[in-house]
Every structure is written in structure tokens, then in C-alpha cells.
């Protein structure tokens, strides 16, 4: 038994290390290389088989010697079934691609090695269409209609077509819309076996957590002894400073706030969405100076200024330049530049030559140093070019909606004279009213533009309530002040709870902590709900949104467990605050965009939600581990043991959630990509994380029985979560780059 257990540990550790190495090698050698030499190689399959056989034998022997619950046996059995399904797919599945032009017929496909294989039937392309979001040019879906023998088959994103056991997945299309590329997969047995394993895993995990015979119950009772006891916290020093400088070179036109707000309600096509100008203004101003306001002026006022009072605003030093090299090339002192600072005395763009040289020489360091400044310069140029002011809709042939900016050539549009004059002159009239401060006239013109939009684009222009909601969201979404406030308060509460020696102060601290948790939860829920309503989809499509959801999930978990587990109550707001801080830092002004077609699946939303809940629990175990090490340092042995039990208890739902989340993601991938597992870097690291966190759940690992070792392990294990969420996005490659 002992030798068999050691063999399992060695093989499992080897697999984890190989997976880590493979993801690193992939970033330099490419996906095809690691797929051929590692993931699909015979020796790697043998390694997994050895782990499966050894684990199966060990479970049988262990069952005969000790009272192992049926639910725990089923968990392990489900993984064996999943591995059997994967082995079946590896040995029996076929895959390839076909490319068809309209009305073209084929009976073959090309496999990954470029070899031709017979399908056993003929398939032809009837037509291919790109379906856009209403009123925009953003693709909502790609739809291919095939004919296999005499049967018509529809293939689109998240909708696989099938015939005779072959599955067709939308993979690409020709630029002239007359051709399509489809992935073809034939896996008659592997998918069914694997899905059986998924179902068995889900049932067994739920049974394990509710069963009274599992180790989880013992850990629950042991962790409960923490209730009412003083918990230890780690103190940290937080220093927050801000500085803003505004240099006025000439008298500006003061734009009335109400007039600017009316202007902000006009809709434009921006970032493939129909959105109020207020959203564009918020994005524009935040991008330039790092915050949605400037010198006491709202984003609407500043944006209107850049449109209607150009000479003044080009002299305002409101463009934040962080890189020293960019500051040096622009000839500015400090980090604030004006648009005029980007031009030399000959009206040449100062960064043009250095950037061209950097790209020519492959100087990535200089490219990185100048990229942010160049992007801000070009955002202003985009505004001047009308890219942010496409406000006049026109429904062309087949209902395709075009949007035009003021002054943009209208081509051969069939418009009467009055309408043409309105399109060409309305912005001039609005500019005159804004500059002269004629509030009534400006409001009237803004309403006329909005009314025109509803006449010409009534099917796609947002309602007044949706516009109000989006502008309200833009105002309430400012992150810096609330995040810093939450972070400061949660740190102070952690410190106070450590220093409070009498129960009276402890009770006050707990009360304040509960109030803070509820305030943060209500605030985060409001932001997520507003973003959901405005975007039209669950806000979990990018890093900013998923970090916000992780903060929300942490707060929910805190409120659920705070009455029984004091450390969770103390650390929940702190972990949530850090999640919000990361969201703020990584994307200070996240844009709301239309979803990529492949992301329009309820399965994906559930996958992300479940995974983020598991990350929240893993984060709590890391903080509890830190607290446990402090207890060890202070020779609080009983407290140290209790905290270790709490970490292990939280691992049960955390590991269950990440396992369920991974396999829901696999089902989504199977529906969207045709494969339930493709060894993408993100899914590989999620598997690594699950394997790492599964180890402490096995009582047979003696090293982890010691509380100190358990706490160290929990801290180090969280590095895998950080790598899965951040490292893969920034350092590795894969299909999850949009996450």
C-alpha cells in the first residue's frame, strides 16, 4: 500500500510538472509542437494510464481495509471514466477540415497532417451568411447551410451540425462570403463515455458534500471551534496619493453642464455598439487622463469641449504620459502633455519617426514605452476623423444599417433636401448654441437629432430608459474612490480585530465588518446588474468583469459562512477589495462591447460563474493559511490546527466547483469547437490548479497532516490560481486571450 501510494504521488507530481512545462514550451515552440510531442504522445498517454490504474488498485485495496464512503469512491470512479473517454477519443476519433465554395460538393476532408480522408457521403455548401447585431457591423453569428445527401444541415457558432456521426463546426469563411471552412469531427464513442464521467462526477461531488460519512463533516465540526475565538490578521501599509495638474493657456468656452448632458444623450455607433455619447465621452476622457472628469468638468463637458472648442483644449495639459522616454521625446516636464506637445514646429508628429524605427529594428522595449502615448494621440485623431460621432443612421438594402458622422460624404443615399440639410447643418447649429450658452436651443436641437435617430433607426436605437440607465452606470462605475475606501476599511478592520482583546470590541468589529460586507455586496451587485442590462449579456466576458464577479462571489460566500467561521468574516471584504482593486488596475476604463459570436452561450456564463466561485474560496484558504502561519509563529497550536481544518473544509466545495466548472467548460467547448478538450493553456492550467488543490483532500498524504505544512501549501497553491487567471493571459498563448 505504501509503495503504491508513493507511486501515485510521484506520477501525479510528474504529470503536473509536465503540464506546467508544456504550457511554457508552447509559448515559444507553438501549439502544434507540444500537441505532437507531449499532449498526444504515447508516453504521456501511458503516464495518465499508469496513474489511473494505480489509483484504481489503491482505491480497491483501501476500500477493503477501511470504511471509504461510496460517494468518495464514485468521485474517483468518475475520473477513471473520464480518462477512459479521453483514451477512447485519442485512439478512435477522427478530425479534419473541409473548405467549400457555394454550390460546391465534396466527399473528403483533410486531417491535421494534410492527408485526405473519405467521409462516406457527399456534402455541399448551399449558402453562408454573416448575421450582424441589429444596426451595427459587429458580427453576431456565422451561419452555414449545408446539404448532405438530401438532408439540409445548419451550422453556426454554438450550433453544431451532424450527419452520420460526423459533426460540423463553423471554423472560418472566405472574404467574399461565398465560401466557408468547417471543422469535421468523428468521435462515436469517446464523447458519450466522457459525458457519462461528467454526469457521474457531478452527482458524486454533490453526494460527497451532503453525506454524513465523509471527512468533510469531521473538518466542519473541528473548524466550528473557531467561532467566537480571536483570529489573527496580517497588517499592511497602504499609501494612496493622487496628483493632477491643469495649465490653462487661454480662456476657454464654458460649456453648461445641462447642455453637455443633453448632448451626451445623443446616440452614436461606437465600438460596434449603439450607445449614448456619454459612454464615448467617459471612455475618451478616462483614456486621456485616467479618470472620467477633468478640473471639475464632467466627461460630457470635456468631450464637448474637444469638439466645439478645439483651439483651447489642444493646449490643455490633460494627457497623462507615464513613460519617461515618451516624456523626453515630447519635450515635456512631468507626466502631463497637451495635444500641441505632440507636434514639432514643422507640424510633424514627434513620435512618428521613433515608432517607425522601433518597429523596423524590432525594438520591443521602445515600442512598449511609446505605445500608450501614441494610442492617446490617435484617439484624439479618431475623434477629429468622425469615428466617434457616427450619429445619423440610414437603413440601406436588406435593412443593413449604416451610420454617418457629421461632414461625412453620404454617397448616393436617397434623402430629400430637408433631411440632407439637417444632417449637414444640425451639428453646426448645436455647436453655435453650446458655445453661446443658448440652453433652450441646444436642448431643442439635441432632441431633434435624437428624434431623427428614432425615425431612421427605430428598430435599433436604445430607448430613453436604456440611455438613462447607461449614463447612470457610467457615473456610478467610477472605481477609484470606493475601491480605496473598501480596501482601507477592510485592512483597518483586520488590524482592529487582531488588537481587540475584549469581547465588547470584538462584537463592534464584527458588526462593522458585517455592515461593510453588505454595503460592498449591494454596490457590486448594482454595478453588475447595470452592466448586464446595458450590455445585454452576463458581464463575464473579459478580465475586468470576471474580477468584479469574483469580488461579488467572495462577498456572497462571506455572508453565507460568517456566522460560523470568523476568519471568513474578517478576510472576505479584504479579498473582495483586492479583486476590485485588480479590476481597476488592469482595466481602468473597460469598454462594454458586443459579445464575440462564440461567447454567446449560457454554458459559458455558468462555466465562468462556477470557476470564479472556486477562485474566491481558494483566495480565502490562502488568507487563512497566512493567518495560520502567524498563529504558528505565536505558538497558538490549537488555533493553528483549527485554521488548517477550516482550510481543508473550504477545499471540498472549492475543488468541487473548479471540477464542475472545468467540465461545464468542456461541454461548452464541445458544442462550440467540436472538442471537449484541446489542451489550451487556460484549460491546462485550470486542470493543474484542480490537481494541486486536490492533494490536501487526501488524508493519506502525511506531510499535509501537519497544520504548518498545510498553511504553507495553501499559500503556495494560490500561485496556480494567479497563473491560471493572470499568467496565461499575459505570458502564455491560447484561445482564452479574450478572457
Stretch-by-stretch model annotation:
Residues 1-739:
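Solvent-exposed, non-transmembrane regions of integral membrane proteins
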